């Protein structure tokens, strides 16, 4: 009976130690994410990646977002299991991908699309013009989608974080600040 109790205590101790390590790792990731959010603007570090360091295409934008750690990572690289290739033709784009990630413990969806500026079809022109004018677009009979264009209008971002109330956002929340940072860096690309 003493051995049985000792075995249960050992298993409990191992579980507590293992969970404790995971908890510290999670805190470390959250702390790093918070530090990254606080490092925006003029106080950003010199080693922060710059858009000019990446190819001017969708894969370059994805690499840029990966370097900034906006997308889900696994073993220091983009976690491909979180990536979905989208039917970009629905919005007239050349190609697009959707990424499932998280920030502040909340699920986030990031969709990135690339347009061929020399060959915009009518759908692309309509979507781009709508996003420029109102910050959103509609396709088919679906509800409107909030979206952002890069400064050169070559790329489109759809950023979805259900923890942010778009009607009355808490501008002091970490998730709101993170979204604004992502949008700011996206627009520069």
Language-model features, listed with the residues they occupy:
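A short, solvent-exposed beta-edge/loop patch
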Residues: 135-189
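Positively charged n-region of N-terminal signal peptides that target proteins for export
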Residues: 1-9
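Short, surface-exposed beta-strand/loop micro-motifs that present aromatic residues
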Residues: 93-104, 142-151
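N-terminal "mature-domain start" segment
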Residues: 22-95, 169-189
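A short acidic-to-branched-hydrophobic micro-motif
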Residues: 101-122
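C-terminal motif of bacterial Sec signal peptides marking the signal peptidase cleavage site
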Residues: 16-20
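Second-shell loop/turn segments in exported
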Residues: 46-52, 109-115, 159-173
